[in-house]
Amino acid sequence: VERFFDLAEEVRLAQAYSSSVNGKTDSKVMVGKYGNFVRSGSYSVNEVLKALKMPKRAKDILNAYWCYLGAHCDDLSFAHYASMVNRYISRGVLMPKMRSHEISLAFIERIRELGGDVLMNTEAVRILTDPSDGGVAGVILDDGTQIQTRHVVAKCAPHLVFGKMMDKVSEEVVRATNARKFSGRGFTMFLGLDKPAEELGIENHNYFLYDTMDTARQYDMMRTIEGNNVQATVCLNRAYPECSPKGTCMLYFTTLYMSDDWANVTPE
């Protein structure tokens, strides 16, 4: 286990170095200072744990966080996973007091500080392209306003972007879009309870509940709603006791589903 965290810390330091030089890393520095990161960088979590001769019980515990990244540990990049687990364990749980809404407000505040504009309740209905090079030229809003830009970040499905928001899309892009399959997607239920966490026996901030510690098998079981009993359960009060009135607590339950089985759910 110590070797895992030593390697995970080297991964973190290598990532910090790469970030400090905007990704223009010196290969001699990478090999000389972060050789273990270079050697493990192309391997999955389970491949590296096997090389470390990790005991099964320790492996099961370390692999518990896989659902945060949505891929099982036979496929999941060790570098990404080790970086996350290392930070989670060494730095502990951090949560904005106003939760995710506070993060959104911070984004808005910083964008405006830098001279940007934030438009609320405004839909971008079309993405314009430059006929000379096919690149992005702007967007049209739902009120007809046209904004010139060479860069667009669209937080929606590629099928919507290329199928409805753009006029000219290359055949290569269409084929690539149609070839994509759904990855893991989340479903979350929030509960406000009229009992404190202590009275309900909830002692920790985060719980992982799995059918099996074989992550590849669990991933496959999560392709159907009926076979999916996985949940990551969080009690917000254990990170921030004042997040709900005294004598109450807040819980949320999250699961992932790995196919489009939810499309088979009827209104009934």
Locate predicted features.
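Generic structural signal for well-ordered, non-membrane alpha-helical segments
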Residues: 1-8, 38-45, 58-59, 96-100, ...
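Rossmann-like flavin
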Residues: 1-76
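Helical element adjacent to the flavin cofactor pocket in flavoenzyme catalytic cores
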Residues: 82-142, 150
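Mid-domain catalytic core of redox enzymes
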Residues: 125-244
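FAD-dependent oxidoreductase catalytic-site/capping-region signature
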Residues: 232-268
